[in-house]
């Protein structure tokens, strides 16, 4: 019983990590866009 539980928690960690990563990348993209807009003005 303990082994599948571990595997499942690993999968949850992976999903959490990827959702955090995508949020972070979106934030970075937003900052880059803001900077480029400021440069263009």
Swiss-Prot record:
Keywords: Plastid, Ribonucleoprotein, Ribosomal protein
Predominant cellular place of this UniProt entry's protein: plastid
Record GO cellular component, one term: ribosome
Source domain of life: Eukaryota
Coiled-coil zones: none
Subcellular location: Plastid
Keyword flag Electron transport: no
Family: Belongs to the bacterial ribosomal protein bL32 family.
Protein name (database record): Large ribosomal subunit protein bL32c
Organism this protein belongs to: Helicosporidium sp. subsp. Simulium jonesii
Gene behind the chain: rpl32
């Amino acid at each position: 019983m303990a082994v599948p539980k571990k595997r499942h928690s690993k999968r949850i960690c992976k999903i959490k990590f990827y959702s955090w990563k995508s949020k972070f990348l979106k934030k970075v993209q937003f900052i880059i866009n803001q900077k480029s807009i400021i440069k263009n003005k």
